[in-house]
Structure formats: structure tokens, C-alpha cells
Amino acid sequence: MRKYLRNITVGAALLLLAGSCTDKFEEYNTNQYQIHDADPATLMKSMIETIVNIQQNDSQMQDQMVGQLGGYLCCSNTWSGTNFSTFNQSDDWNATPWNTPFEKIYGNFFQIQEATNSTGHYYAFACMIRAITMLRVADCYGPMPYSQVKKGNFYVSYDTQEQVYTSILSDLANAADVLYNYYVETNGNAPLGANDPVFDGNYSGWAKLANSMRLRVAMRISGTWPGIAQEAAEAAVTHKAGLIESNSDNAMLSCGTQSNPYQLAAVSWGDLRVNANIVDYMNAYGDPRMPKFFNKSTLAGKTDKYVGMRTGDADFKKADAAGFSIPAYTATSKLMVFCAAETAFLRAEGKLRGWNVGSKKAKAY
């Protein structure tokens, strides 16, 4: 009898203990510092920062190392001979402009998609940011996963390049509609607020950017799919939200608490200089914009000149590059996403193709 009574007592004690342990099970097993109900506005900031890379390593690996092939900048570090300027970059470096956007966009994108049930202004905004970011991937690599990318899918079909650009144009057009309508209907409400480092939450500015990006995409595909390009360009210039057409409209990305990555690479690391190609062109034409773009050389006897560094020299020493001109950025300089000058140029190019994009060619140029 005592045996049974003892067993019953022990069993009851265990039940009481189990009950006390599970009373606060959710509390004990919940990270109080984690965001549980996805707030689309909070998730948006890091997505926006991918359209022009703020993070210093992302900027260097993509915009600076690969970007020097455009002839504007020149990397002044040989990285032991493994670099883009001598066409000897590693496979890992080749993959960075692909991997980084996918890694940094889709985590937050899927959370916003789920939180909004793929509807509304937040979702339209997220689709626009994805479109702007992935445009660069499509330009670099061609066919890629886009329209079929879904949460939880480890194997995704590639879209053709035509499908990618068409989907990007569709996302931009929808964003221009949704964001501008929201802006008008709410009397200028800015739901992103401080989470927007470009327009401080002003959806009117973002709608203009979406339309201006449609012009950019249209021009890039005009030689291959002229029909799609013309339709997109003409729709963009007639959209009620308008375009980025004055410097006050310019889309400029604030670096916030981070240093401007170009200034950091040039001044703190000594890894970036101005490219000789762009300096030679601008010197030849007496271009008055040079002081806005470059700092003058510190080379002996040339401190009154802009002197660019030549790409492709495999034998130079980093110390030899110290005196060449550097980009005229400060630590707090904003990064340009899109400016009115590009809109004017794209319109002029459209007029040359016979598109109905407003403005006369000479005026646009």
C-alpha cells in the first residue's frame, strides 16, 4: 500500500512540475528581440540599400571592381594579380554580382509578400525594389530566375532574358500606378518614413523613379526587342506620376551612419582612383563638370590637373597610385540612383528612334 501511495505521490508531483514548466512555455521559448509580425516598412530599408550598394564590401566587389570596366573608375590594388582590370578575376568574384542581390533581396521580400498577401502599396514597393536590383543582374548575366521565384523553392526555372525584362517592366509599371494613387488618395502620406533613405517615404518620388527606370530598361532592350521597348517608353513618359526631370527630383541614396563606400575605398583603403579614360575625354572637351566629379592630382608637378589612372597594368605598385585623382566624394556624400540628366538623355535617344517620348532631340540633349 505504501508503495502505491508513494508512486501516486511522485506522479502527482511530476504532473505539477510539468504544469509549472509549460505555463510559460511560449514566453521562455520566444526571442523577445526578434520581429515576429513582419512590419513591411521596417523590412524595406535594407532592400532599398541594395539598389546602389551602400555596404562597403558589396560596393567594392560589384560597383567598383566590375564597374572599372566602364572606364569611370580604376582600382588601385592588384590583389596579387587577381582582378577585373587584367581579366583575371576569380570565379568567386565573377559570382558576386549574382549572389549578393539574391541573398539580400529575397529574405525580406518573402516576408513582405506573406505579410501583405501579395497586395497593396507595400507589396508593389517591394516588387519595384526587386525589379531595380535585378535589372543589373539581368544586364550582367542574361537569363535568370525571376517570375517563378517563390519562398521555399530550392529549384527554380530560369526565365528567358525577354521574360525577365518584360516582368521587370511590368513590376515597375504597377508600382508607378499603385504608389502614385496611394500618394494622391492619402494626401501625401509617407508610410515608410525614416525607413526610406532616398525620398523619406514620399511615394510620389518613387513613382517618378519607377517611370524613369522604365525608360532605362526600354533603351537597354531597344536593339533586341524594339516593340516592347517603344511601348514601355511611351507609357512611362505619359504616366500621370511623371518622371525625374529636375535635380530636385533626383533619387539620391543616403548612406546614413555608414561612410560613402567610394570615399572609403579611395581615401581610407587607397584602393580606388579615377580612370584615365573618363579624364582624357573630359579634358579634351573642356568639360566644366570635372570639379564636381574628381579631386585634383597630388602628383609632383601636376597638382593643378586631373590625372586619371590607366587600367590593365599588371605590374604597378599600390604606392605608385597614391597621387592620382580620386572621386570627389566625402564620407557623407549620397549615392546617385537616378538623375534628371539621364531622363533627358533617354528621351533624346528615344526621339532618335522615332518614339513619341516628348521633348525635341536638341532640347533633350
What are these regions (language model features)?
Residues R6-V10, Y28, M134, A218:
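General helical structural elements
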Residues D37-A41, C74-Y365:
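Structured, solvent-exposed acidic/aromatic patches
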Residues M1-G19:
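Sec-dependent bacterial lipoprotein signal peptides
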Residues A13-L17, C21, Y281, M336:
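Generic secretory/membrane-interface signal
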Residues I8, A12, I51, S297:
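Residues that line or immediately flank small-molecule/substrate-binding pockets and catalytic motifs
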Residues C21-C74, S80, D92, Q111, ...:
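Membrane-proximal, proline-rich intrinsically disordered regions
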